Structures are given as C-alpha cells and as structure tokens.
C-alpha cells in the first residue's frame, strides 16, 4: 500500500510542474495556449498573473502541546510546507515530502469556521504580542470569544515556540488542552485518531532525517515569506474561533523555525467537539496557503468575501475519494488525468482556445531567434548561424574550465568509443574489411575535432550509426552485383554529397525538418532496431552453421588465416559471450536508475555499462584458452583495415579498373539517399538537444552544422573513411553530462537546471582520445565478434525504449481494461488507435521488404515518403485531436535519474 501511495504521489507531483500548466506566477503571455480538447475554464476568474506584492510562501503548522520533561505548555512544530508537505515524526525526523491529503470534513469545517472567522488585512504590527492583542480585541468585538477569555488566550498565543531540533531535549511532547486555570487536561487529539492522522504522522522509510534549518533554508527562494498556522484546544471556549491575519509588511516574529519573515497568521482554537480534529483543520489551512492560486488571492484580497471566493474555488478543484478499497494500483493512478483537468480549470483565466502547438511544426515564420526562420537570401540561414553562434567562441573555451567538463570527457569518450568499435567491426564484416575499425576510429576523430572547432552546436557528438551501416551494406551489395569498385563509388557519392549540401544550405532547406513528425521518426527507429536484432541472430546462426554441434570433431584443423573446419564449443561460447554482453549491459542500464547504492555510484556504474560489459566478457573469453572465437580485425597502428585492397587515398577514376562514367553521374542517386539519412539524424538530433527546457543560451545552427557534417563526410570518402552524422543518444548524453542542476529546489520536487556548460573542449578532447584509441590494437584485437553482436542486440532493444509505436503494438495484445492512462489511449477510440498502429506497421513492412530486396539502396527514399503520407493522407482518416495524441512529440528531456527512464526514452531515433 505504501508503494501504491508513493507512485500516486509521484504522478500527482508531476502534474504540478510549471511546464505543464499555466502557473499563476508566470505572466500569461509566456504560457502556451491550452489544448483544443480541454474543457473550458469555469466562470470563476482566478488571478493568473503574478502581482508585484506576492511572494513564495513557507508554511509552518504548530500545535499546542506539553513537553514531557518540564511539563510546560508550548507551541510545537508539527508540519511544514515548501510546495510539498513534510510531517514531523515522533522520533524528531522529518517524513518524506509528499502531496497533501485532506479529509473531506476538514475542508467543509474549514469553510464553515472561515465564514464566521475574523479577518484582519494589512495589519501594521511588527511583533507577535501586538498581533495577538489586536486579534483578540477583534475576537471580542465580533463576539467570537468572551472578554474573560482574553487573558487566557493571550497567554496561550505568547507561549514559547519549539521546533524539530528541540524535540529530543524536551523528552518528547504530548497533545494538551488549554483550560481556564492553565492546567493541561485531555489530549488535543481524539483518543481514537483517524487512519488519516496516523498516516501523516508516521515517519516513512524515505524520511529526510537530519534536515537542518540551514539545509531546508537553501531550498526556499530568497524573497519568500512565511505563514504560521497555530492550532489547539481550549475547553473554556464556547465555539471554534478562526483568525486570519495578513500583515502589511512581513515581520521577523521569531515564531517559525527558519529566519523567514512572517506575512500571514492562522489561529484555530476551540473546544472539543465530536467531529472536529483541530490538527486536520490546521493541515487544511496550511495546505490552502501553500496552494498557488489561493496564495496570490490571499496577498491581493481586500475583504473576507474575496478570500471565501478563492476558498470556494479551491474546493471546486479538490478531489474526494469514496471510502472504498482501490482494486489495483492502476485504479488509483487513473486519478491523475482527472486532477490534471481540474488544475487546467483552476489555472486558466479564459475559455480554452485551439491548441497551436500541434501546428508549430508548420510555422515557417518563427521568431527572430528561430534558427530555422527563412531569410529569403542565398546562404542567409548560414550567415545567421555564424553571426549568432561565433561571437560566443571565446566563452566556448573559457567555460570549459570546470571539473564537470573533465568528468563529461571521460564518460563521453567511452560512450563514443564503444559504438565506434562495434560498428567498425560490423562494417568490416559487411564490406570485407574495405572499411573497418581503424577507418571508423580515424574518421570519428578527425571529423569530431573539426566539428568541435567549427560547429554551431558543439555538444552534438558526430559518429557512425545504424542507418548508415544499413546503407553501406546495401551499396556494397549493389557494387558487388554490378562489378563496381565499392570504395571508388563512395568517392563519387562524396562529391555529390558536397554539391547537394551546398544547394540545400544555400536555399535554407533545413526548415524541412519541421515537417518530419514523430510518425516518421518512430518508423525509422523501429526499422533500425529490427535490423539490429535480426542481424545479431543472423550472425549467431552463421556461427552455428560454421561450427555445428556434433559428437566428434577433427582436431587437426588448419587455423590460418581462419579455421578450415568446425571447432568444438565455438558456437556455444559465442552464444554465451553474446548473451552475457547483452544481459550485463541491460542490467547495468537498469541499475543506473534503481534505488541501490548512492546516486553518484549508480550513475558511474550505469554510464559505463557498455564498456564494463565488454570488459567482463572479453575477460571470460581470455581465460577460456582452449576454445576458438573469431576476434575483431584491427590493423597494427595507423594502417587501413585491408592494405591489399586499398590505401589511404582513393583514386576517383578507379583502383584496379576504370570506373564507369555513367556511374559517376548515377552516384547522385545514392548520394541523395545518404543525404536523406544524415539530414534526418543530424537535424532531429539538433532539435532534441536544443529543446527550450534544456535552457541553453548560446543557440544552435542547423544550416552550419549540416554543411559541416555532410561536407566532412564527402571529403572523408576520398580517403576511404566513413561519413558520419550527429548521433542522437550520444548527443543527448553529452548534453546531460554537461548540465548543472541547481541545489535550491523544493524538497521532494524535481531539480531545476542551473546552467549548461556550452563549450567546445569536451567534444574536442573526446575526438582526440577516440583517435588515439587506434593505438590500442593489442587490446582491441582480443575482442570477440560475439561480444560486439551482444552490443548490437543491446542497441536494438534499447532503441525500442520511448517508441510509442512499440508501446501501441503491445497494446494490440492487451484487453482495453489494462491499457494505460495516456492521451493516445484515453482520447482516441481503441479501434482507431489500432488503425493508426496498423498503418505504421504496414509502412514498416514495406520498408523491410525494400531492405530485403536488391532495391535496398532505395530505403531512405521510401522512408521519406512517409512524410507526405502523414501530412496529406492521415488527416483525411483521423481527426485533428486524434493526431495530436497519436503523433505528439511529448517526450520530456531527461536530466535526473528516474526509475525505468534514461536518454533512450527521450529520443525516438535509432542509435
């Protein structure tokens, strides 16, 4: 039950994040328009803009108690609110921050006593004694108390205020009741306290034990003001009394734990009554003051009526759970979208308008800082990129002097090296070593250095990727079939690539990335994942065919240059190495976001999961000396992978025979296909890294980066090296590693970004280190290919994370009652959701068929046809609101660890 409650609190807390709702503290002009399908706001017009006189509020609830040691009455801190609620346990430790849960009767009773209570606005007092005297005088004037009760209540209000750090010295406390003589009698709480009270007074496992005042103080904004809520029982009173005081200026009354000036004071006192729990009334009042809309109304109210009006609005947007058992965790989590709708109503000040965010992708006239805005001039976008980004060049160097940058270099080096080795080994397999590990490492190093020095967004990590591997395999097969020199054909493709990118940049073609929606991205990513998984098992089957399991073997097999017959245990060991690498990498990825060990240790282990997995399985293979496994082919030093087939410079007219003239011109077609792949990956990666929530300040440059990446790839082909693209997962990981999260965040709330170390040195050093890795031939040559197959399988499986298409395919096999509460399930009929999924599956099947035929070179062209399919045909089948839900880019940037989520969940692009 505790886990269920924690999950519910996490989901509800997510709804309070400012980026999802119109926050009253943010000017309306800065907020996004509400979605078209949202219910219109209620007629009540709440304050939705910040007022110059409003502040963040720290709320403290204190109860009237008696200490066990001195038998003296005092006010004891019981709970506090800094956006979320924290309760003080009996052992003096604070419970974990959580969303406040209120009983229905406490809200009704609070409204009743508030209706009859005393309200003092803009009181000109600077001491607690002055406030208490004026409040009691008003109580008497409004006939809330008798004159003879004044002295007893004044004495009570001026009692000593104690806090969490004093609890142990007091020997504990117990609830007390104020009587006429001042002697304690019955407990403040009823003898049979409710389950609600027990729940909130318990110290949870995730408690924040040892929170010092200074520790909590740095979580509170500097200009915050405090609200003090005092609750207690006084038997001599005839009825409950409530006093609400707003001081004209916040004053240091020395009544709360923190040195925060007090602006508001709630006093709730009264006699014992059958259905009144003053602690719960105090919690309700404190929660009310911590709520954003009521807080602003409390600052701006000019009468009791305005406060009651805001209280009614608070009640209108509160949920009531009936006293029934939740049949499942899913049933409780279904409250989240209901609460989201209530929050929208409360935070919106005008009727809902059509959502413009869905059409943002088609807005070709962005703001003045929009890097995709067209200028209408040749190379106008490129010039704007240079003018926008290069003035920061000096700071790109100086900002790198930070320990965090050094840590990011080490981390990203391994993140870039592992796929470079993996793809290099597989590229050598596909091309008969005409390009392999050495070419890919050198290409990654040289292009990485140039991009780090000249790129507009130096946080992008350029590297080889799955789609490029698929193209290389298809083009190699095409050349083999037609008797063409593969490595020479790539040179002509490189020439055409340079021409294409110059034309596209000249006419500002980068704006076309706006038309590529999640629909196309997910089909692309899913296809590459399937290819990764298929190729892994295809290679494993090939090993079993070459080294079948049989009863007897010929042990006199010639081993040079490769085994000339089947060998014992080779297939089984290859299976173990592949599966072991995959499972170790998967487990370490999950371990990163688990709850074991301190967060820093988890992140270190998880971030280096792939290199650790490779190292473990290489050691396993190393210690099994009597079983053969095929190793990675790496030349010694600065040499090409196959020196008998090529050198470092490729002659454009042919190496062994004259290259056909018709193919020189026909290479424009495969060049266009390569350009499509690089354009898709690089531009979408730039969009993801440049999301506004990442709070980067130096900007990016789509045109400049595209020119560099494609241009460098075209030149690299002349030297027989692979062309590269901006890699999505590695780039997002790089940006996350350089993101500095602020410490002054609300307890229990998500950390806020303080800054991002936008600089060029980390990318530069990573590229240099990758290049130097070519000298690691003695180590690299010991890596079995089966280990790389395991990493290949890992990349295929992890690429499925965050792909909504994969989630919807799984829903095809689940009854509707087990479907999650997400927009594309809740707002779209099930059969129409499955229809959308079916259309994507058909597109995927067509792409797979194309990939499996001799026409596999045309794969990128067929892929790009899904863009007009999405933009032209699907709107004829699905309503606008359905497409918003099914094709929305709702992935959130991942900065901090969250169980079950990482960078792979943020992107819908292949690895």
Swiss-Prot record:
- Glycosylation: residue positions: 642
Positions of the region Involved in anion transport?
Answer: 559-630
Q: Which organism is it from?
A: Homo sapiens (Human)
Question: Assembly and interactions?
Answer: A dimer in solution, but in its membrane environment, it exists primarily as a mixture of dimers and tetramers and spans the membrane asymmetrically. Component of the ankyrin-1 complex in the erythrocyte, composed of ANK1, RHCE, RHAG, SLC4A1, EPB42, GYPA, GYPB and AQP1. Interacts with STOM; this interaction positively regulates SLC4A1 activity. Interacts with GYPA; a GYPA monomer is bound at each end of the SLC4A1 dimer forming a heterotetramer. Three SLC4A1 dimers (Band 3-I, Band 3-II and Band 3-III) participates in the ankyrin-1 complex.
What lineage is this protein's organism placed in? Eukaryota, Metazoa, Chordata, Craniata, Vertebrata
Q: What is the effect of changing residue 609 to R?
A: In DRTA1; detected subapically and at the apical membrane as well as at the basolateral membrane in contrast to the normal basolateral appearance of wild-type protein
Q: What is the effect of changing residue 566 to S?
A: In PN(a) antigen
Put simply, this protein is called: Band 3 anion transport protein
Superkingdom field: Eukaryota
Q: Which gene encodes it?
A: SLC4A1
Outcome after substituting residue 455 to E: In SPH4; Benesov
Q: Name one GO molecular function term.
A: hemoglobin binding
């Amino acid at each position: 039950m505790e886990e269920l409650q924690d999950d519910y609190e996490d989901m509800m807390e997510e709804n309070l994040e400012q980026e999802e709702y119109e926050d009253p503290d943010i000017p309306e002009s800065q907020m996004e328009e509400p979605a078209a399908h949202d219910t219109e706001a209620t007629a009540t017009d709440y304050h939705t803009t910040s007022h110059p006189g409003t502040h963040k509020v720290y709320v403290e609830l204190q109860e009237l108690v008696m200490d066990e040691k001195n038998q003296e009455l005092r006010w004891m801190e019981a709970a506090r609110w800094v956006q979320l609620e924290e309760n003080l346990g009996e052992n003096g430790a604070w419970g974990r921050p959580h969303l406040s849960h209120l009983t229905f009767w406490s809200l009704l009773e609070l409204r009743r006593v508030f209706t009859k209570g005393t309200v003092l606005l803009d009181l000109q007092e600077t001491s607690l004694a002055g406030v208490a005297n004026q409040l009691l005088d008003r109580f008497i004037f409004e006939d809330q108390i008798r004159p003879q009760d004044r002295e007893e209540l004044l004495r009570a209000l001026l009692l000593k205020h104690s806090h969490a750090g004093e609890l142990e010295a007091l020997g504990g406390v117990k609830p007390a009741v104020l009587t006429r003589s001042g002697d304690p009698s019955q407990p403040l709480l009823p003898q049979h306290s409710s389950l609600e009270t027990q729940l909130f007074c318990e110290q949870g496992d995730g408690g924040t034990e040892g929170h010092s005042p200074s520790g909590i103080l740095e979580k509170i904004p500097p200009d915050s003001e405090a609200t003090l809520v005092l609750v207690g029982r006084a038997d001599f009173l005839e009825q409950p009394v409530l006093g609400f005081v707003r001081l004209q200026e916040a004053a240091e009354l020395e009544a709360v734990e923190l040195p925060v000036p007090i602006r508001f004071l709630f006093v709730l006192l009264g006699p014992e009554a059958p259905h009144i729990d003053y602690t719960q009334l105090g919690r309700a009042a404190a929660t009310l003051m911590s709520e954003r809309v009521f807080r602003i109304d409390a600052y701006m109210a000019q009468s009791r009526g305005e406060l009651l009006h805001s209280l009614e609005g608070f009640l209108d947007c509160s949920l009531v759970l009936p006293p029934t058992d939740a049949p499942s965790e899913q049933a409780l989590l279904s409250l989240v979208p209901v609460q989201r709708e209530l929050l929208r109503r409360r935070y919106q000040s005008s009727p809902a308008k059509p959502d413009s965010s869905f059409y943002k992708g088609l807005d070709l006239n962005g703001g003045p800082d929009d890097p995709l805005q067209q200028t209408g001039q040749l190379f106008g976008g490129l010039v704007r990129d240079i003018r926008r980004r290069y003035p920061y060049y000096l700071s790109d160097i100086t900002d790198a002097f930070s320990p965090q940058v050094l840590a990011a270099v080490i981390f990203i080096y391994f993140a870039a090296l592992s796929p470079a080795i993996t793809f290099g080994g597989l590229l050598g397999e596909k091309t008969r070593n005409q390009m392999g590990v050495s070419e890919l490492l050198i290409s990654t190093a040289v292009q990485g250095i140039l991009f780090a020095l000249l790129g507009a967004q130096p946080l992008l990590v350029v590297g080889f990727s799955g789609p490029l591997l698929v193209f290389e395999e298809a083009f190699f097969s095409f050349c083999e079939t037609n008797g063409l020199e593969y490595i020479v054909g790539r040179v002509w493709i490189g020439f055409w690539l340079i021409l294409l990118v110059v034309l596209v940049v000249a006419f500002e073609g980068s704006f076309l990335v706006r038309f590529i929606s999640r629909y196309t991205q997910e089909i692309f990513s899913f296809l590459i994942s399937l290819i990764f998984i298929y190729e892994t098992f295809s290679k494993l089957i090939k090993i079993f065919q070459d080294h079948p399991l049989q009863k007897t073997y010929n042990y006199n097999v010639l081993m040079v240059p490769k085994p000339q017959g089947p060998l014992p245990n080779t297939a089984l060991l290859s299976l173990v190495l592949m599966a072991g690498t995959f499972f170790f990498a998967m487990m370490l990825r999950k371990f990163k976001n688990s709850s074991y060990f301190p967060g820093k240790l988890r992140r270190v282990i998880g971030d280096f999961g792939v290199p650790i997995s490779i190292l473990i399985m290489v050691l396993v293979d190393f210690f099994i000396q009597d079983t053969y496994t095929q190793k990675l082919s790496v030349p010694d030093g600065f040499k090409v992978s196959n020196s008998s087939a090529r050198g470092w410079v490729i002659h454009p007219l042919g190496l062994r025979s004259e290259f056909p003239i018709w193919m020189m011109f026909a290479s424009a077609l495969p060049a266009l296909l390569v350009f499509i792949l690089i354009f898709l990956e690089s531009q979408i990666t730039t969009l993801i890294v440049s999301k506004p929530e990442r709070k980067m300040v130096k900007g990016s440059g789509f045109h400049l980066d595209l020119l560099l990446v494609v241009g460098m790839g075209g030149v690299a082909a002349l030297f027989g090296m692979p062309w590269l693209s901006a890699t999505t997962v590695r780039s997002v990981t790089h940006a996350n590693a350089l993101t500095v999260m602020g410490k002054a965040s609300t307890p229990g709330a998500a950390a806020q970004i303080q800054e991002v170390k936008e600089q060029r040195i980390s990318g530069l050093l990573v590229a240099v280190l990758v290049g130097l890795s070519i000298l690691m031939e003695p180590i690299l040559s010991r890596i079995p290919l089966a280990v790389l197959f395991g990493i290949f399988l890992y990349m295929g499986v992890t690429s499925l994370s965050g792909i909504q298409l994969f989630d919807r395919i799984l829903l095809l096999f689940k009854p509707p009652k087990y479907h999650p509460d997400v927009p594309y399930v809740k707002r779209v009929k099930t059969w129409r959701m499955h229809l959308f999924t079916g259309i994507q599956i058909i597109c995927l099947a067509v792409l797979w068929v194309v990939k499996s035929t001799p026409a596999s070179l045309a794969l990128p062209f067929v892929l790009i046809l899904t863009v007009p399919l999405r933009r032209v045909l699907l709107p004829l089948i699905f309503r606008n609101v359905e497409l918003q839900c099914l094709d929305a880019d709702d992935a959130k940037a991942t900065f901090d660890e969250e169980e079950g989520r990482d960078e792979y969940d943020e992107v819908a692009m292949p690895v």
